[in-house]
A protein has these predicted regions:
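Hydrophobic, ordered structural segments
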Residues: 81-138
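An N-terminus-focused feature that recognizes amino-terminal "leader" regions
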Residues: 1-94
């Protein structure tokens, strides 16, 4: 769903934000919203949230402070073509997102740099992996 400018301004007015509507509207950016489905089988490299990531056979699982990062989601970039945000991204390949959900680093501290990772896989055979056991991750 996308709101037209008049609809957005009316919504702001309805919720008591009319005096801020123009400033809020300038902050809007294109976005894509994902919805959970019960799709049984996602092909390798397909878009999905959770589960195990599809990665190359020589992939080294990302770590932070001795712990394996958690896999969040992967996006097939071909699925994003036609959306307003697509020109800012490659037209093909898979993005895989990892994050330390236990420590939840914000990234302000340079020591937090390893607390999140985004990988772009292009033109390689991908296979689904499970997260390493905490005991064998070291």
């Amino acid at each position: 769903m996308s709101l037209s400018r008049p609809d957005f301004l009316a919504l702001c007015e309805q919720h008591g934000l009319g005096q801020h509507a123009d400033a809020l509207h300038r902050q809007l950016r294109p976005r894509i919203r994902y919805h959970r489905t019960d799709a049984p089988d996602v092909p390798p490299g397909g878009s999905r949230i959770g589960g195990g990531p599809d990665v190359p056979s020589d992939f080294e699982w990302p770590m932070h402070n001795g712990r394996a990062l958690d896999f969040l989601l992967q996006l097939n970039l071909a699925d994003l073509q036609g959306f307003a945000c697509a020109p800012a991204l490659p037209a093909h390949g898979t993005l895989a997102f990892f994050y330390d959900v236990q420590e939840q680093p914000w990234g302000f501290d340079p020591a937090d740099r390893t607390g999140h990772r985004v990988y772009w896989f292009e033109g390689v055979d991908l296979q689904q992996w499970d997260a390493p056991d905490a005991e064998t991750a070291f």
